[in-house]
């Protein structure tokens, strides 16, 4: 059985500000990242719209159900993420961290499986996570804003927030936006 579900994805890439961002070669980064990730899990899983949080290396993917949360409330979580970052850097001054963030939205196909206790209950088919990873890798290598919205996420934002957003950027034919720089 297949079900369509509107979702949003927050993709984060956590990096050490001054040191190498590798868990094995930089134990201070591992400690900072672990603290940040634990605080993030405790805060975000309380929200009814949070479906899943995945971590791979220094990347974190947060999947939101758009039936339970709107784009504006998901964008508000950026403030929570930034607050957790400040707390992490205060507790781990030897390895301060920063992040890049990409927000994406779209329809995900969920395929229910006949499962036993060892198999997953469902498979989510979507290219949204792959697209966010491509944008994260592009903005991580250059002087771009640390937060980007794909066009699909941008369309869901209210007009009052769209007024604060500037011209588009293009990565691998993916249109993205960011906030206007402060003067």
What is the predicted role of each segment?
Residues 1-49, 182-183:
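Juxtacatalytic helix/coil linker segments
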Residues 1-2, 120, 131-134, 140-183:
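Intrinsically disordered, glycine/charged-rich C-terminal tails and inter-domain linkers
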Residues 17-20, 60, 153-154:
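A generic structural signal for short hydrophobic patches within well-formed alpha-helices
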Residues 31-50, 62, 66-101, 105, ...:
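Alpha-helical scaffold within the catalytic cores of cyclic-nucleotide enzymes
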Residues 51-55:
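A short pre-motif secondary-structure segment
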Residues 69-72, 110, 123, 144-147:
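Catalytic cores and conserved motifs of cyclic dinucleotide signaling enzymes
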Residues 75, 111-140:
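Catalytic-core segments of nucleotide cyclases and related cyclic-nucleotide turnover enzymes
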Residues 109-113, 156-159:
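Switch/connector loops and helix/strand junctions flanking conserved nucleotide-binding motifs
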